[in-house]
Swiss-Prot record:
Keyword Cytoplasm found: yes
Organism encoding this protein: Ralstonia nicotianae (strain ATCC BAA-1114 / GMI1000)
Protein name, per record: tRNA-cytidine(32) 2-sulfurtransferase
Note: The thiolation reaction likely consists of two steps: a first activation step by ATP to form an adenylated intermediate of the target base of tRNA, and a second nucleophilic substitution step of the sulfur (S) atom supplied by the hydrosulfide attached to the Fe-S cluster.
GO cellular component assignments: cytoplasm
Residues that bind [4Fe-4S] cluster: 114, 117, 205
GO process terms (BP): tRNA thio-modification
Catalytic activity: cytidine(32) in tRNA + S-sulfanyl-L-cysteinyl-[cysteine desulfurase] + AH2 + ATP = 2-thiocytidine(32) in tRNA + L-cysteinyl-[cysteine desulfurase] + A + AMP + diphosphate + H(+)
Location in the cell: Cytoplasm
Length: 312
């Protein structure tokens, strides 16, 4: 397979972004065993490819085990992933669990099955990780997924909550990591096309994409068309939170604010971002030649001395 210079730049960029995310959040450490979850989609294929490349030159030792869950969906091509994983030479496990029948039994026809399917799949993944001795579980969610989830939670859940690059499972047994957290979906898609990954469609179950998620995704794509770079800016905002400029009393001690010694800087008080109002500059505050600044107070309704009184 011959690749262009553009492809090599793309590959380098994805590896660099994943490496930076791994470093920023300490996703992978020396001695880790990482269970790499493969669905057969573009994101998980790209994640495995990037992790294998980083593993070869990493200054630490860690183990990768690829995992695919065969959920017994009708038409699922059972030989595709084993064939690919043997070809690339990575240790792997195929887990068979008929979650498909459970989902079809529990969810009414025509309804979205993704939520229940995800919960069942998560349980199988956690159990498999424990059996294999894997302390890290790698998922293929990317930057766009994180931003999309942020708006879903804000619009429909009333929370400023996204999808964290790293988190502990509820029982504390494993750490879930998302190495593609800094990677854009369009670049992952371009990489997957160039690599000619054997993609397995995600709609074999017959479920429709969640309507709310679809609408938010369309909204973000339209924003990106109108103002390229907007998704990048939104993701950057998730990394630059200013609790004093929100309204969550659990994040910032508003009740503890007092006069006297400032608890936040003047820049934070008056703002320095592009869409804040211009900072208020007090007369004389930046000029040592002015020793005293006087102001006059005019009691309500009283005209200054010597001024003409208004006509009755």
């Amino acid at each position: 397979m011959t690749f262009s210079n553009n492809f090599h730049r793309l590959e380098t960029r994805l590896q660099s972004q994943a490496g930076r995310a791994i470093g920023d959040f300490k996703m992978i450490e020396d001695g880790d065993t990482v269970l790499v979850c493969l669905s057969g989609g573009k994101d998980s294929y790209t994640m495995l490819s990037v992790l294998m490349a980083l593993q070869k030159r990493a200054p630490i030792d860690f183990k990768l085990i690829a995992m695919n869950l065969d959920q017994k969906q009708p038409g699922f091509p059972e030989d595709v992933l084993p064939g690919y994983l043997k070809k690339v030479g990575v240790e792997y496990v195929i887990v068979e669990a008929d979650t498909y029948s459970i989902v079809k039994e529990k969810v009414p026809e025509g309804k979205t099955t993704c939520s229940l399917c995800s919960r069942l799949r998560r349980g199988v993944i956690y159990r498999t990780a424990k059996e294999l001795g894997a302390n890290k579980i790698a998922l293929g969610h990317h930057r766009d997924d994180i931003v999309n989830t942020f708006f879903l939670n804000m619009f429909f859940g009333g929370k400023m909550k996204a999808m964290p690059p790293k988190l502990a499972t509820d029982n504390g047994d494993h750490i879930v990591i998302r190495p593609l957290a800094y990677c854009a979906e369009k670049e992952i898609a371009a990489y997957a096309r160039a690599m000619e990954f054997p993609i397995i469609p995600c709609n074999l179950c017959g479920s429709q994409e969640n309507l709310q998620r679809k609408k938010v995704k369309e909204m973000l794509l339209e924003w990106e068309r109108q103002a390229p770079g907007r998704i990048d800016n939104i993701f950057s905002a998730l990394q630059n939170v200013v609790p004093s400029h929100l309204a969550d009393t659990d994040l910032f001690d508003f009740n503890g604010l007092t006069t006297g010694l400032a608890k936040i800087g003047e820049e934070a008080l008056f703002g320095q971002t592009a869409y804040d109002q211009a900072p208020l500059v007090f007369a004389g505050s930046h000029d040592d030649r002015i020793e005293f600044v006087r102001f006059e107070r005019n009691p309500a309704g009283k005209a200054p001395e010597g001024a003409e009184q208004p006509a009755a």
